[in-house]
Structures are given as structure tokens and as C-alpha cells.
A protein has these predicted regions:
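Conserved C-terminal structural/oligomerization subdomain of aldehyde/semialdehyde dehydrogenase
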Residues: 25-34, 218, 255, 309, ...
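Rossmann-like NAD(P) dinucleotide-binding subdomain of oxidoreductase/dehydrogenase enzymes
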Residues: 121-264, 393, 458
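Structural signal for hydrophobic packing residues in well-ordered secondary-structure cores
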Residues: 54, 58, 73-80, 84, ...
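ALDH superfamily catalytic-core signature
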Residues: 228-373, 436, 485-487, 492-497
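Short, well-ordered beta-strand elements within core beta-sheets of diverse protein domains
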Residues: 32-38, 52-59, 145, 254-257, ...
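N-terminal Rossmann-like NAD(P)+-binding subdomain of aldehyde/semialdehyde dehydrogenases
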Residues: 1-131, 324
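Residues at or immediately preceding the N-termini of alpha-helices
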Residues: 26, 40-43, 62, 95, ...
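Residue-level signal for inorganic ion chemistry
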Residues: 29, 65, 87, 109, ...
């Protein structure tokens, strides 16, 4: 059985594990490796190494840092096939989706190659007689990134390129179910020339995560995961004096207006709902059909969804893989059962799906449920599976009220050909990322990613300009260089003329 270790100080590290986690292939149901679970001593060692390395790394010139980021970007491109196969084996998504994930993550490396521009400060001359002021942005220190299973490459890449490029050391805690991409990333950073100890990978259970949140040697925490855990991360981290960004769950809605091109909407809704088996925080699990367009929309979405080839991620032509594990499959089917019991109509049922040769895999087919009650769990819970719930509204006003009633506010979209309605929507909707005829409005890397309400705790979004601000601290420097003229010191706040 293959053993997956940590990565500390530029090399694999076994330490003194407190246990082992069985890493399963969701497409086969077979255990493929065992992941070492870190002890407190292992985490302490990683933090000690990171703190020592960060002090020297922060002194490295921006030119040298960007050079390393350029090399890292190319290495990720060169090794994307290897990384994608790791993702297929541990997460289950199909190969093309895994490649797409890596490419989207690499966009943040693109942004990090221009960190010298992002770190440009401000300068004001002559704020008083002979006095100038300028600002600096300096690294916060040691950053921990706690990441989910669904994007083993992309979500960490939302964090570590900017954190590292701005002069921090980084400790990545990957999801135990999908650790291998993190280890490959560490190897590539070393090959790119990053000094040992600046990027580390430590795996562990909930006890270790609690230790991360409380550790005095960790200065900042980036988290992406469920909302309940995001609350724990935010509250515990802040209580222990850390800078925290905690991105939580989602239950994204799209409004479909009757004036929209329904086939265009259906095609894009199908891709947004069922891509990556719905296991993404920007998936589209809920559609609000307005003005009686629901039955026609459901029929059109079904026509697209029925064409999706479900199977093992490396098999030719497969467009959708399994969900992550048996527990997740059971949870999702339970939500469908609950909606059906409360009067919903299952238009397309993926529950009975079995893939020949992969009978132990955790497969669900695309599922469409119409006339979903607002009281059903399928409507209110974060599904994280290949299920689309369709609810109905008579007017735009009723539809936007339904969208905004959700405690989540990650992403939201509208399909319409009416510019006035679209403009109202972008102002009315309570979400951090908004799409107009775009069902998955994920920003590119030079914009920031983040939701509202229960989808983001705190106020700092991830990557882009807000990512730079999160991983750095501002410093204002006021200077005066005395000349032959002497200025008297003053105790007042009055400016000298």
C-alpha cells in the first residue's frame, strides 16, 4: 500500500503520525493509499521550519520572487497531465475537468508573476514642509491554507502563489481525501527554486486543524469549505489573534426569465448543475423559473442532461464522474427522497445509475427535480451533487425574493434578454459573484473571489487585489530630511506652512 507523507523543509517528512487515513478512489471504491496524519509535534516542526524560512524569504528581491513564480507556472503546465491523473484517482472528476481545474488555478500563478506591480505602494510629497509619506506592504509571516476535497489543485492555487510571492511562508493542509496534488505542488516549487521551508504540506484530522487555528506561530489562515466549519475557523482563529479569511458553503440560484432564449439557458444550466458532479461551490443547484417557463425549461435541460456520459474519469468520452464517497452519495439521495416526499416531481432520476465494471464506485447520474417545495431540504441545503432543483415564481419580484431568502450568497445568475431586468438583478441580488446569462460567474484571477452572507465570513475575498491585501500588512512611512533650515518641534496637530 502506498504511503503519502507530509512535505516539510523541502523534502518528504513522515514524523510521528497519530494515524493513517485511507485514500479511496471514488470511481472504483478501492483504497489506493494511506495518508499519514500529523501529530502536534509534526505541526510544530512545520511551523518552526516555516518561520525560519520566511524571515529570509521576505528579504529576497521581488525580481527573484517573480522569476521563481514564472518557473513555477511553467512547471505546473509541464506536469498538468500527471497532476490531473492524481485528481481523477482521488476526487473522481473526469480528466478534462481535472485539466480545466489546473488551468484555472494556474491563472493565479499568472497573477503572482506580476506581484511586483501588485505591491506598488503610494507616495505623497510635501504633506508638510519638507515632509513626505509613502506606504509599504509587507508579508504577514506564516500562512496556513486549509482546503476542501473538491478542487485539490485549484483552491490551494487560489492561496499559495500570492501568499508566497508576497513574502510569506505557507503551510498547506489539503483535504485528506485528495492529498496528492499538494505533494506534487511542493515538489514543483522546489524544482522552481523556492527555498526549502517556504512551502510545506501537512495533513491531519480535525484535531490537527484545531491546533492550526490556535498555533501561536501561524499568523494568518485561509480556509475554503463548509459554512459550519468556516464559523469555527473564523471564531477560533480571530480569538487567537490571527488574520482569517473563511469562505463557506453555497446554494447558488439562477433566475430564468420568460423572455430568455430557453435552449441557451438550458444548455448552460445543464453544464453548471452537473459539471464536476455538482461538487463545486459555484455549481448551480437551484433554478427559479419565472412566468410559466418552468415546464419547457425542465424539458430542455433534461434533453441536454440525458446526453452527459457518466463514468470513470479516465475513460474516453466521460463527462461526469462519481461523487467523492458513499456518505456523500447517501446524503444527496436523501435530499432527493425528501423533495419527492414533499410533492416534487423527479423529471430525470440519476439514483439507479450503475457503471458496468465500476459497481463499487459512488456514481449518481444527473438528476432534475421540478416543483420543489421551498420547505424541502433539497432547496435549503448545500447539495454538492449532480442535482438540479427547479422552483417557480410568477414575477421577477417574487423570484428575487426567493433568491435573497437563502442564507448563502456565493453566486447568483439571471437569464434574460431584457437589459433593464438584468441591471435590476445585479443591484438587487445579495451575492458576491453575479452572472448575467453566465451561470457560473467565477471571476478571473486578477479579480477577487468571494461571496456574501454565510458564504464568506469576514470581509476579505480570495486571490486578486484582495488576496494581496490579505497576505500583506500596510505600513505608512513619514520622512523628513533636515536641511540648513531648522524647524521647531510642535506638540500640536497643526501642519507647518
Amino acid at each position: 500500500m502506498r504511503t503519502i507523507t507530509h512535505w516539510i523543509d523541502g523534502k518528504p517528512y513522515e514524523g510521528t503520525p497519530i494515524g493513517r487515513f485511507a485514500v479511496e478512489n471514488p470511481g472504483t471504491g478501492e483504497v489506493e493509499a494511506e495518508l499519514l496524519q500529523a501529530s502536534d509535534a509534526d505541526l510544530d516542526h512545520a511551523v518552526e521550519v516555516a518561520r525560519r524560512a520566511q524571515k529570509e524569504w521576505a528579504k529576497v528581491s521581488l525580481a527573484k520572487r517573480t522569476e521563481i513564480m514564472f518557473r513555477m507556472r511553467q512547471l505546473v503546465l509541464d506536469h498538468q497531465d500527471e497532476m490531473a491523473k492524481m485528481i481523477v484517482a482521488e476526487h473522481g472528476k473526469n480528466y478534462s475537468d481535472a485539466i480545466g481545474e489546473i488551468q484555472r488555478g494556474r491563472e493565479t500563478l499568472d497573477f503572482a508573476t506580476a506581484i511586483n506591480v501588485a505591491l506598488k505602494g503610494e507616495f505623497s510629497s510635501g504633506i508638510s514642509t519638507g515632509v513626505d509619506i509613502h506606504t509599504l506592504r509587507q508579508p504577514v509571516g506564516v500562512v496556513a491554507g486549509i482546503c476542501p476535497f473538491n478542487f485539490p489543485a485549484m483552491v490551494p492555487m487560489w492561496m499559495h502563489p500570492i501568499a508566497v510571492a508576497t513574502g510569506n511562508a505557507f503551510i498547506l493542509k489539503p483535504a485528506s481525501a485528495t492529498p496528492s496534488a499538494a505533494l506534487l505542488t511542493a515538489e514543483l516549487y522546489k524544482e522552481a527554486g523556492l527555498p526549502d521551508g517556504v512551502f510545506n504540506v501537512v495533513s491531519g484530522n480535525r484535531t490537527m486543524v484545531s491546533k492550526v487555528l490556535e498555533h501561536p506561530g501561524i499568523d494568518a489562515i485561509s480556509f475554503v469549505g463548509s459554512t459550519p466549519v468556516a464559523h469555527i475557523v473564523q471564531n477560533t482563529g480571530v480569538t487567537h489573534g490571527k488574520r482569517v479569511q473563511a469562505l463557506g458553503g453555497a446554494n447558488n440560484h439562477a433566475i430564468v426569465m420568460p423572455d430568455s432564449d430557453l435552449d441557451f439557458a438550458a444548455q448552460h444550466i445543464s453544464a453548471a448543475a452537473f459539471g464536476a458532479a455538482g461538487e463545486r461551490c459555484m455549481a448551480l443547484p437551484v433554478v427559479v423559473a419565472v412566468g410559466g417557463c418552468g415546464p419547457d425549461l425542465a424539458r430542455r435541460v433534461k434533453a441536454h442532461a440525458e446526453k452527459i456520459k457518466v463514468g470513470y474519469g479516465m475513460d474516453e468520452g466521460v463527462e461526469m464522474g462519481p461523487v467523492i464517497d458513499a456518505k456523500s452519495k447517501e446524503f444527496i439521495t436523501g435530499l432527493i427522497d425528501d423533495a419527492e416526499a414533499k410533492g416534487a416531481e423527479v423529471v430525470l432520476d440519476g439514483r439507479p445509475l450503475v457503471i458496468p465494471g465500476h459497481e463499487k464506485g459512488h456514481f449518481l447520474g444527473p438528476t432534475i427535480v421540478d416543483n420543489v417545495s421551498l420547505e424541502s431540504l433539497l432547496y435549503s441545503e448545500e447539495v454538492f451533487g449532480p442535482v438540479l432543483a427547479i422552483v417557480h415564481a410568477d414575477t421577477y419580484e417574487e423570484a428575487i425574493k426567493q433568491v435573497n431568502s437563502s442564507p448563502f450568497g456565493n453566486g447568483a445568475a439571471i437569464f434574460t434578454n431584457d437589459g433593464g431586468v438584468a441591471r435590476r438583478f445585479e443591484l438587487d441580488v445579495e451575492a458576491g459573484m453575479v452572472g448575467i446569462n453566465v451561470p457560473i460567474p467565477t471571476p478571473v484571477a486578477y479579480y477577487s473571489f468571494g461571496g456574501w452572507k454565510e458564504s464568506l465570513l469576514g470581509d476579505t475575498h480570495i486571490h486578486g487585489p484582495e488576496g494581496v491585501r490579505f497576505y500583506t500588512r500596510a505600513k505608512a512611512v513619514t520622512t523628513r530630511w533636515p536641511s540648513e533650515k531648522t524647524y521647531a518641534a510642535t506638540m500640536s496637530f497643526q501642519r507647518e506652512e
